[in-house]
Amino acid sequence: MAGVVKKSFESPDERRTPDKTDVQVVNLGSVKAARMTLQPGWRWSECIKPIAGTESCQIHHEGMVATGHMHVRHEDGTEMEIGAGDAYVIEPGHDAWVVGSEVFVGYEFDSKAAETFARS
């Protein structure tokens, strides 16, 4: 593999489009990265839970928010809102939803999340 690799989310290797969800995945060799575009009204427990088949999201997320806001509620009782410019880590065992009328766009670079989130 080359020492420098570049791919564009405008031409993703894979695209997933569950309800109110658009996930573009690029394969950078040893790492997969994802751009998640979530529409107002998106909620994990409504849009992704039917695909995942679990009571809460069991994916470990590491990423950053480009636009919009999302509220995250973890099974351990912690809750937080993340927004544009924030970097985040979200452990497995959570629900999340878009806050307000702005589209949420987040980028994730954890290979497991990019590889499996919103996959049917």
Predicted regions and their residues:
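Short acidic-glycine-tyrosine-enriched beta hairpin
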Residues: H74-G93
